[in-house]
Amino acid sequence: MAPRSLYLLAVLLFSANLFAGVGFAAAAEGPEDKGLTKGGKGKGGKGTKVSDDDTNGTDPDPEPEPEPEPEPEPEPEPEPEPEPEPEPEPEPEPEPEPEPEPEPEPGAATLKSVALPFAIAAVGLVAAF
C-alpha cells in the first residue's frame, strides 16, 4: 500500500491540472468584451448587446392607426383557366464541397493542450494507487 503522501500528491497534481485546463479553455474564448447581453424577445434579437437607448419595449412615437377603408365592390367570377402542362422535374443540384476547417488562432487552446494535463494527472493517479 502506498503511503498517504503519494495519494495527497496525486490529488494535488490532478487539481492543479484541472485548474490549468480550465484556464486554457477560458483563454481560447479570447479577450473580447464580455459585456451584458439581453436575450429573449425585443429589439435586436437574442444575445445582442444592451444599448443605452433601449426603451424597454415601448415605442416612443406610436403611429396613429389608419382609418378603415370602404369595402370594394365584388368582382365578377373569372372564367376557369385551362390546366397548364406539367413542368419537367428539375435536375438535382450537385452537392457543394465542404469548407475546409479554419486553422486555429495562435495561442488558442487546442484539444491537445487541454487534454494533456488531464492525461498526466490520470497517469499520476494510477501510479499512486
Swiss-Prot record:
Keyword Lipoprotein: yes
Signal sequence extent: 1-27
Segments annotated as Sequence repeats: 59-60, 61-62, 63-64, 65-66, 67-68, 69-70, 71-72, 73-74, 75-76, 77-78, 79-80, 81-82, 83-84, 85-86, 87-88, 89-90, 91-92, 93-94, 95-96, 97-98, 99-100, 101-102, 103-104, 105-106
Lipid-acceptor residues (GPI-anchor amidated glycine): G107
Subcellular location, record wording: Cell membrane
Bias kind Acidic residues: ranges: 53-104
Span list, region Disordered: 27-111
24 X 2 AA tandem repeats of [DE]-P as annotated region, ranges: 59-106
Keyword field: Cell membrane, Glycoprotein, GPI-anchor, Lipoprotein, Membrane, Repeat, Signal
Presence of keyword Magnesium: no
Pro-sequence residue ranges: 108-129
Residues annotated as glycosylated: N56
Chief place where the protein resides: membrane
Membrane topology: Lipid-anchor; GPI-anchor
A cellular component term, taken from the record's GO annotations: plasma membrane
Function of the protein: Major surface antigen of procyclic forms.
Name this polypeptide is given: Procyclic form-specific polypeptide A-beta
Protein source organism: Trypanosoma brucei brucei
